[in-house]
Amino acid sequence: MSAKKPMALVILDGYGHRETQADNAITNANTPVLDGLMANQPNTLISASGMDVGLPDGQMGNSEVGHTNIGAGRVVYQDLTRITKAISDGEFQQNETLVNAIDKAVKAGKAVHIMGLMSPGGVHSHEDHIYAAVEMAAARGAEKIYLHCFLDGRDTPPRSAENSLKNFQELFAKLGKGRIASLVGRYYAMDRDNNWERVQKAYDLMTEAKAEFTFATAVEGLEAAYAREENDEFVQATEIKAEGEESAAIVDGDAVIFMNYRADRARQITRTFVPSFDGFTRNVFPAIDFVMLTQYAADIPLLCAFAPASLENTYGEWLSKEGKTQLRISETEKYAHVTFFFNGGIEDEFEGEERQLVASPKVATYDLQPEMSAPELTEKLVAAIKSGKYDAIVCNFPNCDMVGHTGVYDATVKAVESLDECIGKVVEAIKEVDGQLLITADHGNAEMMIDPETGGVHTAHTNLPVPLIYVGSKAIEFKEGGKLSDLAPTMLALTDTAIPAEMSGEVLFK
């Protein structure tokens, strides 16, 4: 069998691009190899943060998200951005599970109940999503829309719910129908440690309107809780019902939509609506259509609006199906990233996939050994390139990120310089076997060592772009405006391999 000419992807973890020279461990390092590549080889900048990698706008990238996007060949949206995007492009409003539950209740003259963490925190839920759900129910003809508000105070300031409640009161006034039906702190409604006596308070509040307190408006109920020295998180079960209004308890035939997207604190309260539940004795158990926004657990037999997105035909899986061989190689610190995360959350190797792990050095902090295990990793990588065994190789060098996180500037400069030497050897090996190489990063870090806002040490990732450099015999010209999810289709195109339909990323050369 003839020797294979590998397509290698080298990810310099934490190697971002920043024009400013000040406090930039990358531009201030002595890097003749990388400088030469930038001067003489096709190169461009690609995005590694925010919506381009499925994160909220402006949010810095991270290694897990970065490698998932690279391996998937498509933008992988986190639940928050996935739902936000679905709302903005109309997919949410057309969601079959939500539409059916609402329409069934409307047809029967029943209520649509919407429950969830009423918060702009964006950790477990987002109030913008709840707002959209209320508007959707109204648009589909629901007359009775009842909002059961779980109050935050953990991912938001301890007493910050008033603004959210006022916004919803205004929305209902504008719609001319629906109302806030109940308030309770997340301490009760979102317990995750089997404190069922807490969860029961929230369940009884929603199914029986059983409450310690009743007030005519949500803001009055909240003010009373504050007067009792209860912060948002700990607000006791409070029914919101003005004189003459009918009860907003959940009854047979109603639809209930739970708008939290994060599973861990949504599971317990959701399980109370499952027939087989035995955590406490339920006084009433209404026959309803209950919709989870996302899947909170595979064993909860309730409707789900947004099923987990499974990543079919990632780069690794596709190469395997095409009968190709591949190697994943890194140090301990980033080994999971080039394997588990790169494979879309799959632990096992695909057929034809091999893995090599180089132990990261045993030092207290990596500024003490900025080269980490790069020399040994390079030796193994060069041997793999020359072995003729692999069609594709994915390697991560952790230095810029791991040393960058220490905040020690001089050590981070040394880390960059040690990598430059390593890249020189990798390029040489690729040229020797007539292979191809892409050098990039999953996110930035080392290019900003001092926070320009505070003047303090900057140890976090950045939201800056990352370089992409091509080494190989093809005369290519890169397009502008790429992102991490474009790398897999680009590598497949460079090796004249078919690109699976699931990969919505673009080929980055003209």
UniProtKB/Swiss-Prot annotation:
BP terms from Gene Ontology: glucose catabolic process; glycolytic process
Pfam families named among the record's database cross-references: iPGM_N, Metalloenzyme
Pathway(s) annotated for this protein in UniProt: Carbohydrate degradation; glycolysis; pyruvate from D-glyceraldehyde 3-phosphate: step 3/5
One GO CC term on file: cytosol
PANTHER family from the UniProt entry: 2,3-BISPHOSPHOGLYCERATE-INDEPENDENT PHOSPHOGLYCERATE MUTASE (PTHR31637:SF0)
Superkingdom per UniProt: Bacteria
GO molecular function: manganese ion binding; phosphoglycerate mutase activity
Amino acids binding Mn(2+) 2: 13, 63, 442-443
Details of cofactor binding: Binds 2 manganese ions per subunit.
Gene: gpmI
Cofactor: Mn(2+)
Family affiliation: Belongs to the BPG-independent phosphoglycerate mutase family.
Catalysis: reaction(s): (2R)-2-phosphoglycerate = (2R)-3-phosphoglycerate
Assembly, per entry: Monomer.
Coiled coil: none
Catalytic machinery residues: 63
Binding site for substrate: 124, 154-155, 186, 192, 262-265, 334
Keywords: Glycolysis, Isomerase, Manganese, Metal-binding
Class of enzymatic activity (EC top level): isomerase
Gene3D superfamilies, A to Z: Alkaline Phosphatase, subunit A, BPG-independent phosphoglycerate mutase, domain B
Descriptive protein name: 2,3-bisphosphoglycerate-independent phosphoglycerate mutase
Main function: Catalyzes the interconversion of 2-phosphoglycerate and 3-phosphoglycerate.
EC number: 5.4.2.12
